[in-house]
Design a protein with these regions (language model features):
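Accessory interaction regions appended to the cores of large information-processing enzymes
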Residues: 1-175
Length: 175
């Protein structure tokens, strides 16, 4: 799908189960658009504990290759220790790259410089299994990017609207 068609589209995705589960929010943008400026702003404005990175892969830092479309990853929670930081930027970083590349391989989005992907990522501080975390990040990102690009199934949207008075959330215990 061309960058012009996806600018400003959002989605979320979840992969796996706690504590190694990964939750992401995704924003797709077109280079040069107002939404693209938001992605660039997120990338160029780090703060203590929150370091935006450009998704890159390779066996070592000297051989990094940028994932296309360019993908900015921002952590939603500050790393609590070196282990958590390695999981966020290593295992999740590889999973994000794989998930984006899965959606490119399916033909859903283009691997170009005009499409931009912003991934806001959450990982439980108790996570510990890097292989599982990587797989869960891949699942979450692939689902979110695909949903952002093509939208939700109309029947699923209608189901939510019909159930609007009884929808639940795991962090809400009320009626």
């Amino acid at each position: 799908m061309a960058a012009e068609d996806i600018d400003g589209r959002f989605a979320q995705g979840w992969g796996g189960a706690a504590p190694n589960g990964v939750h992401v929010n995704v924003l797709l943008a077109r280079r040069g658009s107002a939404t693209g400026a938001v992605v660039a702003g997120a990338f160029t404005n780090p703060s203590a504990g929150f370091t935006p990175v450009l998704a890159s892969v390779g066996p070592d830092q000297q051989s990094y290759e940028t994932v296309h479309p360019p993908t900015v990853v921002v952590n939603k929670i500050a790393p609590v220790d070196e282990r958590h930081e390695k999981l966020i930027f290593g295992a999740c970083g590889a999973g994000v790259a794989r998930g984006v590349l899965d959606v490119v391989a399916s033909g859903t989005i283009d691997a170009d410089q005009d499409t931009l992907v912003l991934v806001s990522l959450w990982l439980d501080t108790a996570a510990e299994d890097e292989t599982t975390v990587c797989a869960n990040a891949r699942t979450a990102v692939a689902a979110a990017v695909a949903e952002a690009a093509v939208g939700r199934d109309r029947a699923a949207v209608e189901r939510l609207v019909a159930a609007r008075d009884t929808v639940r959330h795991p962090f809400y215990d009320g009626a």
